[in-house]
Amino acid sequence: MEGNLTKGPILRTLTKLAIPIMASSFLGTLYNITDMAWIGLLGSKAVAGVGVGGMFTWFSQGLAAMARMGGQVQVAQCIGRGEKEKAHGFAQAAVQLAAFMGMAYALLSLVFTKQMVGFFQLADAEAHAAAMSYTKIACGLIVFSFMTLTLTGLYTAQGDSKTPFLANLIGLVTNMILDPVLILGPGPFPKLGVTGAAIATVTAQAIVMSIMALAVIIRKKENVLKGIHLLAKIPREYLGGICRIGIPTAVQGMAYCAISMVLTRMVSGYGAEAVATQRVGGQIESISWNTADGFAAALNAFIAQNYGAGKMDRVKKGYRASLWTVGIWGILITLAFVCFPRPIAEIFFHEPKAITTAVGYLIIIGFSEAFMCVELTTVGALSGLGRTKLCSIISITFTSARIPLAIILGGLMGLSGIWW
């Protein structure tokens, strides 16, 4: 297989796998930040519309986690046990499941776009129109995102994080070129605005997926993805194994997003600037959680392979090393958000009211960054052991508490109370 994570120095092995994954996660953050920076030139109403549409692409990632997490953990554990044939079977089942769910989500999104966007009760007509346009395109072609996430997980399970990184790098460059061209329409190009942003993002996702798929075909190296058949019947053993690990993760991801949607709906009562702030603020914050999540993905594969091989000492040492790394990163992000909120906000907003709102948001969320990084790392470790149900129960229980707390604090403190 591409990479054996059960041998060699623990920290070096883990870091070698983690750095490309964290870099890929950072590129994912840049995807979104690039969009927001260009869309910000269209005004806060356009940003608010994309923010609403982005909630549904985020929700889809929770569903996609079923195939990604289930496939990644099962494949990595099989590799650790030396069961290459079963690893291939789980990989094929994961890709098939991702393709099916991606197409199903796209179809439902196209049929119910009006109802989905209507949930947020956007009072501004321009923001509502932007949300409709973005959602139809970004969710209507969401299958590329489903496939990309799952292929990334399966590459990572084999100890190969460089291929997804290179694919994402090319996708980012594509997105950065297409964004200003399609959004602003310089020269002979038409100004597509929010629609252009959605087209640029989907095109980049399609390119990333294609590169990872072609790498399997072109390279001569052994890969569990070689020879998969999308239309073959999925054996119950493989489907059940993926769902057993993947469903709790998917439920956790979708529940978290659904709760965020409820909070966004509460925030929308304070105007388009507030919604835009929450959307952009979330993208800025993703510098923290995407990096931690990327390290958690590396730790997940590391632990799954070593757990499958019965090397629990490496499992424990790998977790401790990861915890220190992401904890320090979280502290640095906290300092940046709390000490320099205005310079950060001014990158994305150009209206005084929106900048002031964003400054308050960044300071509030800044205090939780280190804790969040530790949480994501621990979830990655437990998931590598196959304990996804425990992670799901704990996460959903405490995340759900955000709604009553937002109602109480929002009533006492206004908009800032919801964010606290």
What are these model-derived regions, one by one?
Residues 26, 30-48, 117-125, 181-192, ...:
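Helix-terminus/linker motif at the lipid-water interface of multi-pass membrane proteins
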Residues 1-18, 75-141, 189-247, 303-368, ...:
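Short alpha-helical transmembrane segments in multi-pass integral membrane proteins
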Residues 5-37, 41-42, 58-70, 74, ...:
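N-terminal transmembrane alpha-helices
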Residues 16-35, 137, 171, 204-208, ...:
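Transmembrane helical elements of multi-pass membrane transporters/channels
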Residues 54-57, 101, 170-175, 200-208, ...:
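Transmembrane alpha-helical core residues of multi-pass small-molecule transporters
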Residues 47-107, 145-164, 264, 277-340, ...:
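Small-residue-rich hydrophobic transmembrane alpha-helices
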Residues 59-62, 175-180, 209-213, 287-290, ...:
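Hydrophobic transmembrane alpha-helices of multi-pass small-molecule transporters
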Residues 140-144, 148, 152-156, 164-210:
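Helix-loop-helix hairpin linking two adjacent transmembrane segments in secondary transporters
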